[in-house]
């Protein structure tokens, strides 16, 4: 049994993306603090300045950036989870099916449940493919938070084959062969 993981360059790319996402999250937190908690009194604390702004009313110039920063504060951890899941992804073809493991995730996909392979990013340097399955694989994840995060990243009836995976073409070929997919079925699942 061979296990397929991200290549060293794929891991480096994932780390750079995680650092970028963390910087965006810190920027959003800093901007939200500056937007909502500015005070004319330099010695005022964060909550005191925020309370003063609420008492006098927030302007549109404060509300709109604050809402955007709140969206970034919520969305960035979801993006981080997706990158972490990609960074830890391991695919192991076995006689029983394809095993996928990552942080807190262990999925077993029987070969007869694979219905197709869809290319999600056709024009990218390194394409992103999705294995389409007939069942919801995420129901195998016990932790409800990890299950929800996985569904947000991948969807419930597919398993992503990430770009940057070492020998990904060999893995895709083995998946097609073991699941009985023909090139016609793979092409149909791309539509």
Identify the function of each model-found stretch.
Residues 2-6, 109, 157-162:
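Generic detection of short hydrophobic beta-strand segments and adjacent strand-loop junctions
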């Amino acid at each position: 049994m061979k296990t397929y993981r991200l290549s060293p360059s794929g891991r480096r790319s994932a780390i750079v993306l995680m650092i970028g996402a963390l910087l965006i999250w810190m920027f959003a937190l800093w901007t939200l603090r500056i937007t909502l908690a500015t005070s004319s009194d330099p010695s005022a604390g964060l909550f005191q300045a925020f309370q003063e702004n609420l008492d006098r009313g927030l302007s549109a110039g404060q509300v709109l950036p604050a809402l955007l920063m709140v969206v970034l504060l919520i969305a960035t951890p979801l993006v981080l989870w997706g990158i972490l899941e990609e960074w830890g992804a391991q695919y192991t073809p076995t006689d029983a099916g394809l095993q996928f493991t990552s942080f807190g995730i262990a999925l077993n996909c029987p070969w007869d449940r694979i219905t197709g392979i869809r290319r999600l990013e056709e024009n990218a340097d390194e394409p992103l493919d999705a294995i389409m399955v007939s069942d919801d694989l995420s129901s195998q994840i016990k932790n409800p938070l990890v299950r929800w995060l996985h569904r947000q990243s991948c969807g419930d009836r597919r398993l992503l084959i990430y770009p940057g995976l070492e020998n990904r073409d060999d893995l895709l070929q083995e998946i097609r062969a073991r699941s009985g997919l023909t090139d016609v079925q793979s092409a149909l699942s791309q539509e």
